């Protein structure tokens, strides 16, 4: 069973409080999501392997540690996942970026795929799947299904907030995927929104309704 990591770092929790606040405007919301994503990247990549190397500093040789050739990939789920991708890319700029486009039917709440573009060597990469909200889990499960069909073998899921129902569904369908959250919230309401949540992440990121 994949592990669930709730990242309780004070800076993450402080910034998340403003992300949740309904009075936070689009510009500040976008900046805060970017900042929290960057902070989360530190924890998500904590166990990446290192290898010894030698370099020359301005005053002489030094033994250092570098990432051990691990290939990484980011896969934001469109559209809201885009809001987190730049923050993570600043931490791991060599990562390749793919995209999965899904929309959720407002009546059935079921996800529908409309776009997939991935690195050619997706099967060789550790993929960081990004979506700010893990509500029912339907969209994330569909995205991971799509990635696995195209050869992906190793994935981690990164979300700002999640409902227990969504976490349980992802764990049931994809027990090999670890989940990283800034917060695990109380529940879903009757409309499928996370409570207390932060509203519609896509609308708040892009100033739409």
Curated annotation (Swiss-Prot):
Regulation: Allosterically activated by GTP.
Pathway(s) this gene product operates in, as recorded in its UniProt entry: Pyrimidine metabolism; UMP biosynthesis via salvage pathway; UMP from uracil: step 1/1
InterPro entries documented for this protein: PRibTrfase_dom (IPR000836), PRTase-like (IPR029057), Upp_B (IPR034332), UPRTase/APRTase (IPR050054), Ura_phspho_trans (IPR005765)
Binding site for 5-phospho-alpha-D-ribose 1-diphosphate: 79, 104, 131-139, 200
Record EC number: 2.4.2.9
Transmembrane residue ranges: none
Name listed for the protein in its UniProt record: Uracil phosphoribosyltransferase
